[in-house]
Amino acid sequence: MKKLSLLLLSFASAQINYSGEINPSVMTRKSDQSQINLPFRIASLEGGYTFGSVDLKTSIAIEHRWNTGESVFNLREVYLAYYPDWGEVKFGKQIHAWGAVDGNNPTDNLNPYDYYYMFSPGTKRKLGTISFSSKIYVGNFQLEGIIIPKHEINRMPYGEKDFPLSMP
């Protein structure tokens, strides 16, 4: 009983954080105000559970189509992160972002793209992949390594008559 009480007390001292958004929107053409029937993220939620030097991070989204009324649950990211004194270690489904630029970043090519969201900013246009990553800090330098055991392909909008660009 004492061990269970101690375990419950230690979990109570952890930090829980979450944020999200609900975005019911409709895309219409400027030419004739007709509806563009493509999927969009109607809701998203990011959550985290921190206990000491260990984090559990999640990012989920609900993708919806107005024309069919279908909603699809999408687990965008879920990974465990450990932060020792020498760096960090992460394992799970992650979206890796390398570098920061105003447009397309030629070095940010680890994750596949979701072409339904190609005009969205940053990681919103990426798909998560199962991966292991680690950073090691040495003085003013950092060394990062990432292992992605299975190659994932881009999500292409083939057969979508409402997609504004033609696919090859």
Language-model features: locations:
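Conformationally flexible catalytic loops at phosphate/diphosphate-handling active centers
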Residues: 164-168
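A generic structural signal for short coil/turn motifs at secondary-structure boundaries
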Residues: 29-33, 65-68
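Transmembrane beta-strand segments of Gram-negative outer membrane beta-barrel proteins
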Residues: 15-30, 41, 54-58
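Generic cytosolic/nucleocytoplasmic N-terminal low-complexity/intrinsically disordered segments
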Residues: 1-2, 89
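Outer membrane beta-barrel
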Residues: 48-163
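Short catalytic helix/loop segments, enriched in acidic residues and glycine
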Residues: 36-47
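Sec-dependent N-terminal signal peptides
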Residues: 2-12
